[in-house]
Regions:
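A beta-strand edge to alpha-helix "cap/lid" segment located at domain peripheries
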Residues: 37-111
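A solvent-exposed, acidic/Ser-Thr-rich amphipathic alpha-helical stretch
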Residues: 2-54
Length: 111
């Protein structure tokens, strides 16, 4: 995942919808983003709306996991150098959050 290494700031913080506290650091953030790649059915995953304002981006996405529709947003804060400093994911509806939690835990156990 060399692309992630180049994209993430060393002091990045990742906030997951399935973990209670924010996750600090590049290596842990990478681990969660890789697990998300296995979780989010990337064949159907698509960004449907983007809003950018200076060093902040909000990207709305949709996908389907095990026949459950998932709708969410990635909220990203960038450094002046173009690296991700803060990455927060929010998901709805509740059934989707539960499915993502189940799949993420499984993907993380395999890493």
């Amino acid at each position: 995942m060399d692309g992630l290494d180049a994209l993430l700031a060393e002091n990045v913080v990742f906030s997951s919808p399935v973990v209670f506290t924010p996750i600090p650091g590049k290596e842990l953030t990478k681990m969660y983003l890789i697990a998300a790649g296995f979780t989010f059915n990337m064949e159907q995953f698509q960004y449907t709306r983007e809003v950018h304002d200076g060093l902040h981006s909000v990207l709305e996405f949709e996908t389907t996991i095990d026949d459950i529709a998932v709708n969410g947003v990635d909220m990203i804060e960038w450094t002046a150098e173009g690296k991700i400093l803060d990455f927060k994911v929010m998901i709805r509806p509740r059934k989707a959050v539960e499915k993502v939690h189940e799949k993420m835990m499984s993907a993380l156990e395999k890493q």
